[in-house]
Amino acid sequence: MLTIVFMAYSFCYIFILQSDMLAYLQHVLSEGHTTYNRLVGSLIVVFLVFIIHAAVSAITRLPEKLYAFTFLPSALFLAVLTDLIADYSLCKLLIYLAVLVLTVLLYIKTANSASSQRRKSDSTSVYISNVLILCVMMVVVGLCGNSNDKQHYELKMERLLNESKYEEAVKVGAKSLVSSERLTCLRAFALSKSGLLGEKMFEYPVTSTENALLIPRKDSTHMIFHPDNIYKYLGAFPGETSTSYQFLHLISSQPDLLKSRPQIKDYLLTTALLRKNLDLFASEIKRFYDFSDSTLVLPKHYGEALVLYSHLRTKPKVTYNNTLTETNYKDFVEFSEKYKDRLTRANAVRQHYGDTYWWFYYYGKVCK
């Protein structure tokens, strides 16, 4: 019974919680030449866990009340696989070696004690003792495994993008405040594939860096989603010295390419917004939209940016008239003025306007 419980736990732990981490590990070790299968990989790990337990159980003679300790090497294997191998450090290695040494010493002491005191144990106490020991082991394995939210979000999003599940990819980590440069790039790709980059980009946590929405091609060895997928989607590859904006501006200036790849426009405009360069954004957006059209309705974040721009500039290059957006901006300003402390204001405003470009412009960080 204990064996079935631990094997079921091992499968769920690997398949549900750590499969993306193992996929990344296999990708790195094979230099991208093999692909990880979640079901097959999980079954192989469970089989190895079972073999380790069976071997330990066969060569050890522990008292009945301590039988669950035969699962300790298997638990240690799971912890090492999902923590040490995936995220190596000397400190972690020393800790696991110490646990291994303590396990051997504990076995020697327990075995000697058992040989000198052999008596029948109550079946109920034996069962309870083993269940408690096994539960503690499973909890410890869960605590030891890689629990870096950022890394798990990135890997899960990469897997979903490889499977062309763009709507699911967008939702990864959506309710968390965790963000990174890579997460921002991956989510932008998923949103663009769904036609929502200008509409929803700033509804999620974003990290703005020099690369903006483009992942350097050299990062391919550390990703299961190849950066070239983004460049193929845009229809061109950047030069070694060009910045993300220079690259996007260049390809947006090619009429035929822009016509066949309209997503270039959104990448360019969103890049300007991520850099908080409203003047650049205003000069670029005029190339793509006819502002003489009174019925023009822009994607949400573009409209928010232009309303903000018109309030920050005495002579704006372009104006956008949208009553609803204008009203929302005034409410945003009035609400912000209620708080004097910047940190308190940022947190309070996030609760009501965290899904707007305005919040990012005033409180989001732009990394150099």
Which sequence ranges carry the predicted segments?
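Membrane-embedded alpha-helical segments of integral membrane proteins
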Residues: 64-118
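Membrane-interfacial, low-structure loops and terminal tails that flank and connect transmembrane helices
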Residues: 27-30, 61-64, 112-125
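Aromatic-anchored segments of alpha-helical transmembrane domains
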Residues: 9-14, 72-83, 136-141
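Internal/C-terminal transmembrane anchor helices
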Residues: 122-148
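Membrane-anchoring hydrophobic segments
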Residues: 1-72
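Solvent-exposed soluble domains appended to multi-pass membrane proteins
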Residues: 234-368
